[in-house]
């Protein structure tokens, strides 16, 4: 259950789109992986099904039950588990080899590695994650 204060604030911000926001919490979670084009130029023969993510050149949806993080190809770095929506910024930025990139929201690093792959390893990608505070529990 989401906190009521949060829901009240979101209802005010989203207006007529608020019901769609709530409905999204009832749908299954969407999970994705991204091929590491610096290590492979073809899709590996995976033991689980995938489907292309329309907005991500090397992005693929997979069934969360597949557990691709346990596969040796993940350990070898042929693909990176990444939230599908997090793949969009690097696609929209359209970086080119030789450019310089600064990623200020780089935790845990998926976008930074995606940008480096799009630059074909040519050009620096500097990354950090700024936090006003961190709480450990």
Predicted regions and their residues:
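N-terminal auxiliary segments of SAM/dcSAM-dependent transferases
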Residues: 1-59
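Residue-level signal for inorganic ion chemistry
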Residues: 33, 89, 105
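Class I SAM-dependent transferase core
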Residues: 57-95
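Conserved SAM-binding loop of SAM-dependent methyltransferases across substrates and taxa
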Residues: 108-120
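Single conserved hydrophobic/aromatic residue that forms the stacking wall/gate
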Residues: 129-137
